[in-house]
UniProtKB/Swiss-Prot annotation:
Residues annotated as binding NADP(+): V71, D125, D133, N152, Y219, K223, I252, S254
Protein name: Very-long-chain 3-oxoacyl-CoA reductase
UniProt function note: Component of the microsomal membrane bound fatty acid elongation system, which produces the 26-carbon very long-chain fatty acids (VLCFA) from palmitate. Catalyzes the reduction of the 3-ketoacyl-CoA intermediate that is formed in each cycle of fatty acid elongation. VLCFAs serve as precursors for ceramide and sphingolipids.
Keywords, sorted A to Z: Endoplasmic reticulum, Fatty acid biosynthesis, Fatty acid metabolism, Lipid biosynthesis, Lipid metabolism, Membrane, NADP, Oxidoreductase, Transmembrane, Transmembrane helix
HAMAP family named in the record: 3_ketoreductase
UniProt-listed Pfam families: adh_short
């Protein structure tokens, strides 16, 4: 009752002297509101834990039968390569799309040697935005039972850089590859899925799309675009039985991240892709984002804390993000100077 006494004193100090009965009702309303708010937070966190650690995702076979096809963009390295390998292990034929023909050929040979599936390859540079390339992709997938599309192709900045200093070609490539490339590839593949009334469209997002990221402004903006686009697309395609999911990811060991050593927060491509494919349809650490997921356990806990506890758009969070990337930029520039000095000697 100490709370009620303090509540009544507070009302009196504001000149709001209510009748005792009304004071009790007001106190009860405040207690109930606070209790409901706390209970909702607890239930949300329990949902996150169940999604990350207990509940399974949709089985891959629900998207298409054995022998159907999965299209993987950005397939020659890192996450794209791992998606292709694990989907082939699950019995899907694989269409590999990436820039370097020799890498695609090597991966196709590896897949067919390990698994009894078919592969097809298309070497195309998404940065070129060449209509002929997309016509070739359409020709390649037309007539195939494409059950899964993995939109993995992407590009970031070489190092953190202020927007005013961002090279124009780098800025253009990021937007063209991350946004336009993903949209055009998806628009080619989904008509068949809509006709068959099943399928999975999985797009690689980033924490950069959740949190404004100074010194990676163009990349962050491109991933925020994909977040909104994918969520909208998910609602459009749900009546057709198609699952659309954007995967929100922190760092993963890859050429793009320039991180080589794994840790609790930074998984290998194999571990990350395994978590993604086993949790399709589960939000993981992103309970407030429909048609989205943070399935890897540490990324999910981070996403929950950042989006449900903190204010991701607030000055404090954005400022800390800027400070971190300013430090990364300084280290990268010092490293470049050292390497330049070694070459000159």
């Amino acid at each position: 009752m100490d709370f009620v006494s303090k509540y009544m004193s507070c009302l009196s100090s504001w000149g709001l002297d209510l009748q005792p009965g009304l004071q009790s009702v007001g106190a009860a309303v405040l207690l109930a509101t606070g209790g409901l708010f706390l209970a909702s937070r607890v239930l949300t966190f329990v949902r996150v834990l169940l999604s990350l650690f207990v509940l399974p995702g949709k089985p891959l076979r629900s998207f298409g039968p054995k022998g159907s096809w999965a299209v993987v963009t950005g397939a020659s390295d890192g996450l794209g390569k791992e998606f292709a390998l694990q989907l082939a292990r699950a019995g899907f034929n694989i269409v590999l799309v990436s820039r370097t023909a020799s890498k695609l050929a090597t991966l196709a040979e590896e897949i067919t040697a390990k698994h009894s599936v078919q592969t097809r390859t298309l070497a195309m540079d998404f940065a070129a935005n060449d209509d002929t390339d997309y016509e070739d992709l359409k020709t390649l997938v037309d007539g195939l039972d494409v059950s899964i599309l993995i939109n993995n192709v992407g590009k970031s900045h070489d190092i953190p850089v202020p927007f005013a200093l961002t090279p124009e070609d780098e800025m253009t490539d990021i937007v063209t590859i991350n946004c336009l490339g993903t949209l055009r590839a998806t628009q080619l593949v989904i008509p068949g899925m809509m006709q068959r009334r099943r399928g999975l469209v999985l797009t690689m997002g980033s924490f950069g799309g959740l949190l404004p990221t100074p010194l990676l402004a163009t990349y962050s903006g491109s991933k925020a675009f994909l977040q909104q686009w994918s969520t909208s697309l998910g609602s459009e395609l749900e009546p057709y039985g198609i699952t659309v999911e954007l995967v929100q990811a922190y760092l993963i060991t890859s050429a793009m991240s320039k991180v080589r050593r794994t840790s609790a927060l930074i998984p290998s491509p194999r571990a990350f892709v395994s978590s993604v494919l086993s949790k399709i349809g589960r939000n993981g650490g992103s309970p407030t984002y429909s048609y989205s997921s943070s399935p890897y356990w540490s990324h999910g806990l981070m996403a929950y804390f950042l989006t449900c506890v903190l204010q991701p758009m607030g000055k404090l969070v954005v400022g800390q993000n800027r400070t971190m990337h300013e430090a990364i930029r300084k280290r990268a520039l010092r490293k470049a100077e050292r390497e330049k000095g070694k070459k000159s000697t």
